[in-house]
Amino acid sequence: MKHVLVIDDDVAMRHLIVEYLTIHAFKVTAVADSKQFNRVLSSETVDVAVVDLNLGREDGLEIVRTLATKSDVPMIIISGDRLEEADKVVALELGATDFIAKPFGTREFLARIRVALRERPSVARTKDRRSFYFADWTLNIRQRRLISEEGGEIKLTAGEFNLLVAFLEKPRDVLSREQLLIASRVREEEVYDRSIDVLIFRLRRKLEGDPTSPQLIKTARGAGYFFDADVNVSYGGMMAA
C-alpha cells in the first residue's frame, strides 16, 4: 500500500484527502505543521508528499526545500491561489514535481498522485551501484551523493540529480530540451520556456561556481545542451574499461 503524506493546516481539507485516498487503497497521513511532517518522514516510508504552500506561520516552500535535499520523494504543491510562472520557477528550483490549485477535483488529485508514483525513481536506480567521476567530482547513484575532490558534499534536488545523471550517461552528446525534460521528470503540462533553463542554471552554479561562464554544461544553440568533460564510471568499485 502506497503511503501519501499531506501537510495542510486546513482541517476540512485534511479530512477530505484522507477519506478519498483511503477509499482508493492508499495509506494517508495528514499533518498540520512541519514538526509533525518531519516526524513522519523520519519514522516511516513515504511514497508521495503533498505540501500546501499556505501554512499560516510556516513557509511551505521551505518545507519543499528541506525535503528535496533529503529525499527523492515526489512532491505535489497545492495552493489556494493560482501559481504564477515566477512561483513555479521557485518551486521547481526547490524540487517540486507537480502543482495543483485549490479548489481542485478529487479525481484530478487522485490522477496526479498516481502519475507522481509512476514518475518516482525506480527501485532499479536505488540499487544502481554506479559511481561517475568527472572533473573534480564523484556522483554516487545509489547514495545520491555528489562529492567534491576535497570531500565536500553538494546537495541536489531530485530534478538536478536526474538531469546530471542524464548528462553523465551521454557525455558530449547534445541533449534536446525534450530529452532533458523527460530526464528531469518535469511534468509536461507544467512545461514553459524556462523550466530546463532554471535547472541547468542551478546545476551549473553548484558544479562550477560561475554559471555565466560554464565549462561543463554547455549550450548547443538551437539544439540543447551537452556535457563537455571526460566521464569515468565504476560499478560497485570496479572501474569500467
From Swiss-Prot:
Cellular component annotations (GO), alphabetically ordered:
cytosol; protein-DNA complex
Q: Which UniProt keywords apply?
A: Activator, Crown gall tumor, Cytoplasm, DNA-binding, Phosphoprotein, Plasmid, Transcription, Transcription regulation, Two-component regulatory system
Q: How is it modified after translation?
A: Phosphorylated by wide host range (WHR) VirA protein.
Residues of the DNA-binding region: 129-229
Q: Does the keyword DNA-binding apply?
A: yes
Which PROSITE patterns does the UniProt record give?
Answer: OMPR_PHOB (PS51755), RESPONSE_REGULATORY (PS50110)
Q: Which residues form the Response regulatory domain?
A: 3-117
Source domain of life is Bacteria
Q: Which SMART domains match?
A: REC, Trans_reg_C
Instruction: Please name the GO terms that the record assigns under molecular function.
Output: phosphorelay response regulator activity; transcription cis-regulatory region binding
Can the keyword Phosphoprotein be found in this entry's annotation?
A: yes
Any one Pfam family here would be: Trans_reg_C
SUPFAM superfamilies, per database record: C-terminal effector domain of the bipartite response regulators, CheY-like
A Gene Ontology biological process term: regulation of DNA-templated transcription
- Localization in the cell: Cytoplasm
Question: Its function?
Answer: VirG is required for the positive regulation of at least two vir loci encoded by the Ri plasmid of A.rhizogenes.
Q: Identify this protein by name.
A: Regulatory protein VirG
What is the scientific name of the source organism?
Rhizobium rhizogenes
